[in-house]
Amino acid sequence: MVLSNKKLKQRIRQDLAESLSVSVSETNPQSQSLKLLLDSSSHKPRLSKREKRRNCETFAREDDEIRENEVGNGGSSEKTDTKIKKKRKRDDAVEVDELEGDEGTKEEQKPQKKKNKKKKKKRKVNKTPKKAEEGNVEEKVKVEEIEVNTDNKEEDGVVPNKLYVGGIPYQSTEDEIRSYFRSCGVIIKVDCKMRPEDGAFSGIAFITFDTEDGAKRALAFDRAAMGDRYLTIQQYVKTTTPSIPRRKTSSGFAPEMVDGYNRVYIGNLAWDTTERDIRKLFSDCVINSVRLGKNKETGEFKGYAHVDFKDSVSVAIALKLDQQVICGRPVKICCALKDRPATDHTPGETNNAGSYNMEDTYAAADPVPALAGRSEVDDGNYFATTVSSSKVKRRVCYECGEKGHLSTACPIKLQKADDQANSKLGQETVDGRPAMQSYGLPKNSGDSYYMNETYASTNETYNGGYSASAVGTGKVKRRNCYECGEKGHLSTACPIKLQNTSHTNSTLDHQTVEAGPTQVTSYSLQKKTRDTENNGGSFMDESYATVPISIDVTNGANDASLTSAVSTGKIKKRNCYECGEKGHLSSACPNKLQKQG
């Protein structure tokens, strides 16, 4: 006889209960552990590992017996084996619960599990339509975004399939333009712009494609060569209201109103704007004059004007008319900048940079030293080096400790340097006299005129102040003379060199020949030498000046030139083409002059 699963479980539970009751009766009540006491109080018996193993063995034996009985009865054992195996795993995991003997609880748990499974299935079924709904919502959002973008494009005036093309060769035709952009797509329209003056092609065209993709392909031809020109391709922007001009946003710069200055600047005027149009705009204001900005050379209008009003009330009314349309263009109206006079010496302003005089400003703070060179002051180098910027005014002089000048331009330092230079000049240079004109030259027995010229550094001192050779700057004072090796003068003003040249020139005086009367200058300057015994000094006589040259002594002395009289260094190095000797030119050769005489 085949037993059902419920009956098998009931039988097994009865056997377990009997075995438990027998084991409890056999155990000593005194040796009961704490766990057993707790189990008895909670009515939940707990089995040890050994008892669990024994129960498992008994369960296995009983199952084997049941199977044998089923086979003997001719029942199908395959189905029961699979069911028993599945159930056995559950029984092993829930052995403790089975021992409780609560059949009702397990029967209640099964329908709850089934309910939970049904709920899960319902949730899954409900999730799928939600996902579908979410997908539909996302698609709707995307469609809305695309619509918004297209609306924005239309509002901005961007036409996706129309392009602006510039830089087209002037001799190109519409067919040539179509053939050039044929690879991009189907061209619907080509609008070529012509010049209004002569009706010739201006090199600009608007091309409309069939699709937006064709326009995108054509944008790749930007900066491409077409003939001898390069193309400029941009997206076409459509103006929503072409009749009304677009107002330009102002840059934000607006000069402030100045009391008593009622001039207004008007910019962004059309080229055909006249004075009548401006007066019509300011009809509510009292206008004194209107000046249109024009090119001085061509007289063409430059697109701006200045209007002078009678009072500040008219200026305030005029400023409110900013961005009003005149001749199709919105004009800019603001206060004009006030012109500053040239005498306004305000440092730090760019408008007065040309009229700012540094000498007048800093003359009292940093006076020119008494012994400063006249050439430095006249050229403006003194003020350029001493008072160059605000940094110089903040600096302190290392020599005197005062502000306003550098140590290189310190008056005390310059005065000391000039005193030292003057003392050296008193020892090393010659007490000379200013150059004098001499037209009556003494004649020799051979009726020849002589030109006596003596070189002294004192002549150079009279050439507009201190010269570079006698009383130069700090560089001259620090240099050494190449002739004598001493400091304080250059080799061109060395006393020893000048003395030697006087001896060489004296030999030339004896070789000169009588010549015709010539206008020359004689500089008779006595030079001191190092020899204390030679108190008389030496004179240098030069007669190699050319006949047709007339020298203005006063101008030569003032300009510090004396090119014809004081050029011994070059003349001494040259050779005469007539006699082959050094020291004179062919024009002053004694042999040549003798032949001519």
UniProtKB/Swiss-Prot annotation:
PANTHER family: EUKARYOTIC TRANSLATION INITIATION FACTOR 4B/4H (PTHR23236), NUCLEAR RNA-BINDING PROTEIN SART-3 (PTHR23236:SF119)
Record protein name field: Phragmoplastin interacting protein 1
Subcellular location: Nucleus; Cell membrane; Cytoplasm, Cytoskeleton, Phragmoplast
InterPro entries: Nucleotide-bd_a/b_plait_sf, PHIP1_RRM1, PHIP1_RRM2, RBD_domain_sf, RRM_dom, Znf_CCHC, Znf_CCHC_sf
Entry GO CC: cytoskeleton; extrinsic component of membrane; nucleus; phragmoplast; plasma membrane
A GO term for molecular function: zinc ion binding
Zinc finger (CCHC-type): 397-411, 481-495, 576-591
Main location: nucleus
Keyword Transferase attributed: no
Subunit structure of this chain's protein: Interacts with phragmoplastins (e.g. DRP1A, DRP1B, DRP1C, DRP1D and DRP1E) and with GTP-bound ARAC11/ROP1 as well as with Ran2 transcripts.
Gene3D superfamilies listed in its UniProt record: 3.30.70.330, Zinc finger, CCHC-type (4.10.60.10)
Gene name of the record: PHIP1
GO BP term, example: cell plate formation involved in plant-type cell wall biogenesis
Keywords assigned by UniProt, alphabetized: Cell membrane, Cytoplasm, Cytoskeleton, Membrane, Metal-binding, Nucleus, Repeat, RNA-binding, Zinc, Zinc-finger
Region (Disordered): 18-136
Protein function: RNA-binding protein which mediates polarized mRNA (e.g. Ran2 transcripts mRNA) transport from the nucleus to the vicinity of the cell plate during cytokinesis and phragmoplast formation.
UniProt topology in membrane: Peripheral membrane protein
Domain of life: Eukaryota
Record-linked SUPFAM superfamilies: Retrovirus zinc finger-like domains, RNA-binding domain, RBD
Motif (Nuclear localization signal): 112-119
Location of the RRM domain: 161-238, 262-338
Residue ranges, compositional bias (Polar residues): 20-29
Biased composition (Basic residues): 43-53, 112-129
